[in-house]
């Protein structure tokens, strides 16, 4: 059984036991449980497709930790102008493990 969920403007295909890195969920403490209610599709013995979401479906996940990703360097340069910018960016994310899919 798997489901397609929407979180943070992105879609994820998940099944029980999967580990995901979602955009930072404020107030999510490690070892706590969260519910993801925007379920777009559930595929098991039969398929349920939402319009836009499946009624009564949810995905239960347990928070592993909150962390920051690797630094990405953004470098802009204009040739022959002695003009350059250097910026760094680190993505904040919440790592979760999928515990249950309720359809």
Curated annotation (Swiss-Prot):
GO molecular function, one term: structural constituent of ribosome
Keyword rRNA-binding: yes
Cellular component aspect of the GO annotation: cytoplasm; ribonucleoprotein complex; ribosome
Keyword set includes rRNA-binding: yes
Family annotation (Pfam families): Ribosomal_L21p (PF00829)
Keywords: Ribonucleoprotein, Ribosomal protein, RNA-binding, rRNA-binding
Subunit structure and binding partners: Part of the 50S ribosomal subunit. Contacts protein L20.
NCBIfam families according to UniProt: L21
Chain's role: This protein binds to 23S rRNA in the presence of protein L20.
Protein name per its UniProtKB record: Large ribosomal subunit protein bL21
Gene symbol of the encoding locus: rplU
């Amino acid at each position: 059984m798997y489901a397609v969920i929407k979180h943070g403007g992105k879609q994820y295909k998940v099944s029980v036991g999967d580990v995901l890195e979602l955009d930072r969920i404020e107030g999510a403490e490690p070892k706590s449980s969260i519910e993801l209610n925007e379920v777009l599709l559930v595929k098991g013995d039969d398929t349920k497709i939402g319009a836009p979401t499946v009624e009564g479906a949810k995905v239960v996940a347990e928070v592993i930790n909150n962390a920051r990703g690797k630094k990405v360097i953004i470098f802009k340069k204009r040739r022959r102008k002695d003009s350059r910018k250097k910026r760094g960016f680190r993505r904040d994310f919440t790592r979760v493990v999928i515990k249950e899919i309720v359809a």
